[in-house]
A protein has these predicted regions:
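Phosphate-/nucleic-acid-contacting segments
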Residues: 327
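Catalytic-core elements of nucleic-acid end-processing and repair enzymes
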Residues: 397
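Short, glycine/polar-rich helix-capping loops at beta-to-alpha or helix-loop-helix junctions
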Residues: 372-375
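Helical hairpin unit composed of two closely spaced alpha helices linked by a short loop
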Residues: 334-356, 360, 365-367
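Active-site donor-binding acidic/aromatic loop of nucleotide-activated sugar
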Residues: 386-390
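N-terminal localization/anchoring segments of enzymes in phospholipid and broader phosphate metabolism
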Residues: 1-315, 319, 323, 347, ...
């Protein structure tokens, strides 16, 4: 045979192998039994972007929901002390129909509800950082920090230097940061902490050539635990932009400081994540000390992750939506809901519940913002009121319902938070916290404009087409 024939055979074999790999991958996607929307999204990517699509699926598409970060036996040891404290307290009951939500989290997430907590709410990073630094300098035994972003800038260095000061005083400090969220941060930034005896770990490290499908599963939590009795949780990372904002306008976010046994849940979340990376199980009594705070808040610290059997926070939010009788207000920077959440919001709005959704007028990510806008027509058609925040960038993840239920945390209303990220939220079942967060929402509403369905439908066809195309990829963003 001449060279041309051999070349033709070689090309044919390459094409055959290539299409065999693509078809096999599509077959695997179908067998994974995900939601039809997500399955079709991956099939479209593999079909129209065959080479790039296969690579994207290899790193971002494979499911890890059947894996476990920690054995059941290990988790039982870790939760032994919080469980003892939970059993010692009088029976706790939430108001009206919110009890079912609390029971759901207790059973599915092992999120134990505790009464008698105190909650401080922050709507700006300056106030939160001020109190965080005060608590760091008050620490006597340990400080645990877990952040998606811990930048090497003025804010990050301020917190790092405070941690170093306390480490020199003998306080045990552990820092856990997400490897992708902090990929721009030079190693020297963390090396300075390591040299001072601070334990620092990166979550699910991503290094070439050791890429794995876990590059898609990031730790989006923002948790601080100090001496086992004070905690911080919310939407704020440790970075200067959370203080100064992005370009024009401020950065609007929500964070909370917790005092009381509800902090046990944050501690359990941190120690579980620490074990997942370091394989060291920390269960000593000093991490779950006796707490005698006199507060009036009933709360739960709830987590979700891509390796558990259920999508805990997403399912809890659906229950919260469906329990609404008078109103349901939510703030989120990204709105790419799955079918279940979108239908729940539409259904209660159609039933006469006052549903309000607040989003930033300008997003920080073009693709995700365009995808978010594609859902607004359907929401308004069902009677959901859409408020676009125009004073700056709204990064707050806040929900309040019926003056009885509220939550603050790291979870966005999008596929990524619901299915791919490690997230954490604090849920509160008292009127005072709900009213505080409701007042914050209504104050922010003054810096928004109410979107009109009539005006919204007049936007250009170019925008409509762009939004619709991006929406096809929503399950993958």
């Amino acid at each position: 045979m001449d060279v041309a024939v051999w070349n033709s055979i070689f090309v044919a074999v390459i094409y055959f192998l290539y299409f065999a790999v693509i078809l096999t991958t599509i077959f695997v996607v179908i067998l994974d039994n995900r939601s039809p929307v997500k399955t079709m999204a991956w099939i479209l990517v593999l079909f129209f972007l065959p080479v790039a699509g296969w690579i994207l699926y290899l790193f971002f598409g494979r499911s890890t929901r059947k894996e476990r970060l920690i054995s059941r036996k290990g988790y039982a040891r870790l939760s032994k002390r919080p469980m003892a404290a939970y059993q010692e307290q009088p029976s706790v009951m939430a108001e009206h129909g919110k009890q079912r939500l609390m029971d759901f989290f207790s059973r599915v997430n092992n999120a134990l509800p505790f009464s008698g907590n105190r909650v401080t709410v922050y709507t700006d990073a300056v106030s939160m950082l001020s109190d965080l630094l005060k608590d760091i300098y008050r620490a006597r035994h340990h400080i645990h920090l877990e952040f998606y972003i811990f930048e090497d800038d003025a804010v990050g260095r301020l917190v790092r230097d405070a941690l170093i000061d306390r480490a020199r005083d003998g306080v045990k400090i552990r820092v856990l940061y997400d490897d992708v969220g902090c990929w721009k941060v030079p190693h020297d930034f963390y090396e300075q902490m390591l040299c001072e005896g601070i334990e620092v770990l990166s979550f699910l490290k991503v290094r070439f050539p050791r890429f794995t499908s876990k590059v898609n599963y990031r730790n989006h939590r923002k948790i601080v635990v100090i001496d086992g009795c004070v905690g911080f949780i919310g939407g704020m990372n440790l970075a200067e932009r959370y203080v100064k904002g992005l370009g024009k306008g401020n950065w609007r976010d929500t964070h909370v400081r917790l005092e009381g046994k509800v902090v046990y849940g944050l501690q359990t979340a941190f120690l579980t994540d620490w074990y997942a990376i370091d394989r060291t199980l920390l269960t000593s009594a000093e991490y779950f000390p006796p707490i005698s705070v006199k507060g009036g808040v009933l709360g739960q610290s709830v987590t979700s992750d891509p390796v558990g059997e259920w999508r805990d926070i997403m399912q809890g939010l659906m229950m919260a939506i469906c329990s609404a009788r008078r109103y349901f207000y939510v703030q989120t920077p990204y709105f790419l809901p799955n079918e279940e959440v979108m239908t729940a919001l539409q259904t209660v709005a159609l039933a006469g519940v006052d549903v309000r959704l607040m989003l930033p007028k300008r997003g920080d990510t073009w693709l995700i913002h365009k995808g978010s806008l594609s859902y607004l027509s359907e929401m308004m058609k069902a009677g959901v009121k859409i408020y676009l925040y125009k004073k700056g960038f709204l990064h707050s993840k806040l929900m309040v319902c019926d003056d009885e239920l509220s939550t603050v945390g790291s979870t966005n209303m999008d596929f990524r938070s619901f299915e791919h990220n490690f997230e954490a939220n604090a849920f509160f079942y008292d009127k005072e916290t709900a009213m505080t967060l409701k007042e914050i929402f209504l104050a922010d509403q003054k810096d928004c404009f109410l979107l009109s369905a009539r005006i919204w439908e007049k936007r250009s066809w170019k925008n409509k087409i762009t939004e619709s195309v991006v929406r096809l990829l929503a399950p993958l963003l």
